[in-house]
Regions:
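N-terminal pre-domain/capping segments
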Residues: 1-91, 122
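Active-site acidic/histidine proton-transfer and metal-coordination neighborhood
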Residues: 71-155
Length: 155
């Protein structure tokens, strides 16, 4: 059976508070919601709203959004953010975090960039696994709304 999650960043925007968006999703029959930026929200309040409405978080975006292959990038910023995202996911009861690839760097060949990404994501997966959180990758549509993103296909 197919299961859908309402993205409360994009849906129910007539409600300013995300707690109200969770309630609206439940009213419409959703059992799951997802969101992007948990760091911008009171995750304890969202967790309480989800519980009160019989809703589960299916996923949350790993923060910060990051471009891993740019020259001089400080990967510690990503790993610190990942650890905070893991804590937020646990509070929300989300079993997974979504990793984006960030922007590609035009001055570096794609295979080398993918190698860098594989190394970073391997380290990230170890951290997440120790915390009991699953990481999933999201290839995005570079032709429509994510031009320049490194991961734009599933192969």
């Amino acid at each position: 059976m197919t299961t859908f999650a309402a993205n409360i960043e994009l849906l129910y925007t007539e409600h300013e508070k995300f707690e109200d968006r969770i309630a609206a999703a439940a009213t419409d029959g959703f059992k799951f919601v997802e969101m992007w930026m948990s760091s911008l929200q009171d995750v304890h309040s969202l967790a309480a709203a989800a519980k009160a409405n019989g809703i589960q978080f299916s996923s949350v975006l790993a923060e910060p959004r990051f471009s891993f292959t740019m020259p001089g990038v400080d990967l510690n910023v990503f790993f610190d953010g990942l650890k905070s995202s893991i804590e937020n996911a646990k509070i929300l009861g989300s079993p997974r975090l979504v990793l984006g690839s960030g922007m590609g760097f035009p001055g570096k060949k794609r295979p080398a960039q993918l190698d860098t990404l594989a190394e970073v994501f391997t380290d990230a997966a170890k951290i997440a696994e120790e915390a009991g959180i699953e990481l999933v990758l999201e290839p995005v549509n570079t032709r429509h709304d994510h031009p320049g993103a490194l991961l734009d296909r599933t192969e």
